[in-house]
Amino acid sequence: MWSYVWLPLVALSLFKDSIIMAKAATILLPSQTGFDISRSPVCSAPDPNLNYRPVIGILSHPGDGASGRLSNATDASSIAASYVKLAESGGARVIPLIFNEPEEILFQKLELVNGVILTGGWAKEGLYFEIVKKIFNKVLERNDAGEHFPIYAICLGFELLTMIISQNRDIFEKMDARNSASSLQFVENVNIQGTIFQRFPPELLKKLGTDCLVMQNHRFGISPQSFEGNIALSNFFKIVTTCVDDNGKVYVSTVQSTKYPVTGFQWHPEKNAFEWGSSKIPHSEDAIQVTQHAANHLVSEARKSLNRPESKKVLSNLIYNYKPTYCGYAGIGYDEVYIFTQQRSLL
């Protein structure tokens, strides 16, 4: 009896194999299609108005990035490797801008880059604040002179630019948004063209408003009312998104300059793909897409910069001249950081 059961199964298997073989037989070699394989492929000419070798400058922040666990040197500064990876994943290289090196050297390095990231952190006064202010003013000057030069101001970076533009260091209020993921609420009728969100797929834009796809980690924020109530701020930026903290207070979460390629984030676009120290960081496929689109937008803006510095100077100052330190074993904070304790002036 069992032989009769197996016969149909064998026949079915042979039938499937014959279908697969028939499909395989329809695959043609280039010589069978009439395609001239001796002809060289036609590649589109590069756009002369774009820079296909962009470099992003990232400003270092005071301290070792690990609360002194890695270095207690008084002159130490650091850059979390996630910011470097953000720029690199968009197709750029990185030059560290060491905040406490001689200003002459720092601003010569600024001439080697096509965009800047101002990172998260805690320093809101002293030399760091003054350097951020000077970099910001130089970036505006370069844009006013006709060079397209973007800034990504993330978390603390956004807070500092807000203080500088508003000329009010007390404009932020306490918020409860530490170590938590959130959605983003788009301002009604906001035009996202020219913003980080312009190339997001419609489905991802929709999910941003309903799912927790971005990481928040800050104790301060600015309400839309305070933001719009400051003439300097409302003239410079438009509010793109808001968020709600753990106590129900609404704060500004994404802004875009109406005149310059300057984007401000209260949230962290770099963490989803590149930080693992907190279980709250979203790592879903949608969350990773958010990080990738943020990287792509920054570098696409940097490609519009026609600054073409001497190659040797760029190579001598790239982040590749430094080694990151792994600190993820602590289970908190950053996974990797670049620590700078000596000025490296190789211009």
From Swiss-Prot:
CDD domains: GATase1_Glutamyl_Hydrolase (cd01747). One of its GO terms (cellular component) is vacuole. The active site is at residues 155, 268. The keyword Ion transport does not apply. Residues 45-341 form the Gamma-glutamyl hydrolase domain. One of its GO terms (molecular function) is omega peptidase activity. Expressed in roots, in leaves, stems and siliques. It is found in: Vacuole; Secreted, Extracellular space; Secreted, Cell wall. Its EC number is 3.4.19.9. Keywords: Cell wall, Hydrolase, Secreted, Signal, Vacuole. It catalyses: (6S)-5,6,7,8-tetrahydrofolyl-(gamma-L-Glu)(n) + (n-1) H2O = (6S)-5,6,7,8-tetrahydrofolate + (n-1) L-glutamate. Gene3D superfamilies: 3.40.50.880. Residues 1-22 form the signal peptide. It comes from the Eukaryota. Disruption phenotype: No visible phenotype under normal growth conditions. Belongs to the peptidase C26 family. This is Gamma-glutamyl hydrolase 2. It comes from Arabidopsis thaliana (Mouse-ear cress). The gene is GGH2.
